[in-house]
Every structure is written in C-alpha cells, then in structure tokens.
C-alpha cells in the first residue's frame, strides 16, 4: 500500500506554487510543512512529477522519519527521480542520514543536520530540491522546523494548514518566503493503526534480503551510546556492583562515571546515582543501528542481534552488502524486528 498517491485533482493554490517554482532562478529549494495528514507528501509528488515533465532535474529530501516514503525508516533520505512516480515509496535513496528513531522529539539536532546534509548534496545535482517533513509541528516540533529552515534557508516554505499554524508561519518568515496553502478537501486521513501497518510493511521490505554480519568494536567507532567508552571494569568491580544493586553485570566501563550493561537478579533492584548509567541488556536486542561511512552518512541500517562483550564483537542483521566503507556503528532508539514488529522506543538517555 502506498501513502499519498499522486492525483491530478489538484487545488488552484498548488498550481500557482508550481508556476512560481518553474519561474524561479535555479537551483531552487522548497520546504513543505504541515501537520499529520495535511497532504505534504501528495504535494511533493505532484510538484515532482510536474517539474520533471517541464524538464527540470528534481531532488526529493524525505525527512518524515516516522512515515518514510523513501526507505529505510528512521533516516533522512535523498532521492533523485529519473521519471514519473505515483508515490514517494517508489523512489530509491541515493544518500541517507541516520536519526535512529521514528519519534524524533529528542533528536532535533540530528533532524536539522540530516536535512542540511541532504540538501547540500541535492543542490549540487538538481534544479529543484523538494523537502518533505514530519507532521510534528507543535512544541519541540515547531522548533525543529525553525532550525531546519534556518540551516537550509529555502527559497519558499509552503505551510499547509487551516489557521492553526499561524504562529509557526511567523517563526519561519525570517528564513524563506512563506506561502500558506489550504488543506485539500480530498486529503486522506490515516488512523494510527494503519500508520503502524504501513511502517511495518516498510521495515519488512527493507530487511527482506538481509544477512547477519559481524563488526569489531576495536575496528569501528561505536556512537550514540555510552557502551565501549571508557576503561573496562575488572572482575572485582563487577562483583561489587552486583552485590550492591542486585544485578548480573554483563559488561561495564568507567570514565567520569560508570556505565554498566546489566540484568536484574533481585525482584526489586536498588536505586543508583546518576553517576552510574545502568543499561538493561534486553533493551539492546533488536535495536536499530546505522552503518555510517567516513563522511558521517548512513550506508544503511541494521538490527542489532547480539553483542559479545568479552570479545567486543557486534552481530547485526542488515541488507547492506558492501561493508568495506563502514567506519562507525551508531545506536538508534527504536527496537524493531526484521519482520517489521516494533518492540518499543527508548529515551535518548537510556543508552
């Protein structure tokens, strides 16, 4: 199933926007902002197809990490369509930036930087860059949109709303020409369960031809987590922590504070101070990770299946075949199986 399929039944204000883009100096950048189910992806699909038909080279930056059209979820992706497309899910990404979650409220830095990186690449190869964004537009979400606009400075920011985003419109005005579009009467609403099913289908499609691969923590950087950072704890230190807190300590490191991977042994384990970060071993299972190259871009994502802490080796399920460019394994904050079942989100400070 495809979300936001292209339709020729287009409101007049979209036609006027298309005409404005076609007449602008190139390269041109458009950022589309709007709430959930406001028609952002449909607008980008319409504009992309029409601009292609006019002979322009088009780039699409998909930063809707929770409802990605361009695989994989949990990343910001750049696609360069070569011909007509009915939905963004038909597009193949040529570059990605790892965010590592489908709920980016704690990752506004990664979201803003990721869009900036993709737009920088796109402006070098395309006449028109179209940026799709999440439907997260209040509170932290509004700040995220402002940061993206401030970094990218789009030529036009199209805000799709029915009056509820007037405050955000004012906040975006210093960073680009803002135009307001009405929410189309034909826009489709997607219930939460249907959104989950759509995302599960995308996870399954992405991981369909995956294989289990292994990385050494001594050969690649481990980021997005406190694991493997610091001096490993010795047996006496592990035993002391186990007795003090009722844990089975799987691994641990000391830096300014302590980081331990543990499993609870006692039914009611004791509390600990902030200087001690305790990571539940089970929360590492099926964790989404990014395979990062030497330029900080994401070559693809994988599912963490096992860590051999004594040998410092990580087993990851991924469809990425050529691993020679991987320089970093970056931990995300969503647990998901290769069958598409989402096992839960983690807070940023949990790892």
Curated annotation (Swiss-Prot):
Taxonomy, superkingdom: Archaea
Name of protein: Polyribonucleotide 5'-hydroxyl-kinase TK1956
One Pfam family linked to the record: CLP1_P
Keyword Kinase in annotation: yes
The EC number(s) this enzyme carries: 2.7.1.78
Classification via Gene3D superfamilies: P-loop containing nucleotide triphosphate hydrolases (3.40.50.300)
Membrane-spanning ranges: none
Any GO molecular function: polynucleotide 5'-hydroxyl-kinase activity
InterPro entries: Clp1/Grc3 (IPR045116), CLP1_P (IPR032319), P-loop_NTPase (IPR027417)
Cofactor(s) essential for the protein: a divalent metal cation
Function: Polynucleotide kinase that can phosphorylate the 5'-hydroxyl groups of both single-stranded RNA (ssRNA) and single-stranded DNA (ssDNA). Exhibits a strong preference for ssRNA.
Reaction equations catalysed: a 5'-end dephospho-2'-deoxyribonucleoside-DNA + ATP = a 5'-end 5'-phospho-2'-deoxyribonucleoside-DNA + ADP + H(+); a 5'-end dephospho-ribonucleoside-RNA + ATP = a 5'-end 5'-phospho-ribonucleoside-RNA + ADP + H(+)
Record: residues binding ATP: 34-41
One GO-annotated biological process of the protein: RNA processing
Coiled coil (UniProt feature): none
Record keywords: ATP-binding, Kinase, Nucleotide-binding, Transferase
């Amino acid at each position: 199933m495809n979300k936001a399929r292209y339709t020729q039944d287009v409101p007049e204000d979209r036609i006027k926007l298309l005409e404005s883009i076609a007449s602008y100096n190139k390269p041109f950048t458009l950022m589309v902002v709007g709430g959930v189910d406001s028609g952002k992806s449909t607008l980008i699909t319409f504009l992309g197809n029409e601009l292609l038909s006019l002979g322009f080279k088009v780039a699409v930056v998909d930063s809707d990490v929770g409802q990605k059209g361009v695989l994989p979820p949990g990343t910001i992706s750049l696609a360069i369509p070569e011909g007509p497309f009915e939905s963004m899910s038909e597009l193949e990404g040529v570059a990605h930036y790892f965010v590592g979650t489908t709920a980016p409220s704690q990752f506004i830095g990664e979201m803003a930087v990721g869009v900036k990186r993709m737009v920088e690449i796109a402006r070098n190869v395309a006449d028109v860059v179209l940026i799709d964004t999440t439907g997260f537009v209040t509170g932290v979400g509004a700040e995220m949109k402002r940061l993206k606009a401030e970094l990218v400075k789009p030529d036009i920011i199209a805000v799709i709303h029915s009056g509820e985003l007037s405050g955000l419109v004012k906040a975006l005005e210093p960073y680009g020409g803002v135009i307001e579009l009405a929410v189309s009467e034909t826009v489709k609403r997607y219930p939460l369960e249907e959104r989950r099913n759509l995302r599960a289908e995308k996870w399954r499609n992405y991981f369909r031809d995956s294989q289990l691969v292994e990385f050494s923590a001594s050969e690649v950087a481990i980021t997005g987590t406190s694991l493997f950072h610091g001096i490993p704890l010795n047996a006496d230190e592990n035993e002391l922590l186990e007795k003090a807190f009722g844990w089975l300590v799987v691994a641990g490191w000391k830096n300014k504070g302590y980081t331990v991977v543990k499993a609870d042994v006692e039914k009611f384990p004791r509390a600990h101070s902030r200087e001690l970060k305790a990571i539940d071993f089970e929360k590492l299972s099926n964790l989404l990770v990014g395979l990062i190259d030497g330029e900080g871009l994401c070559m693809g994502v994988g599912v963490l299946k096992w860590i051999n802490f004594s040998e410092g080796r990580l087993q990851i399920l991924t469809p990425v075949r050529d691993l020679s460019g991987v320089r970093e394994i970056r931990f995300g904050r969503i647990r998901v199986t290769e069958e598409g079942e989402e096992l839960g989100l983690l807070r940023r400070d949990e790892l």
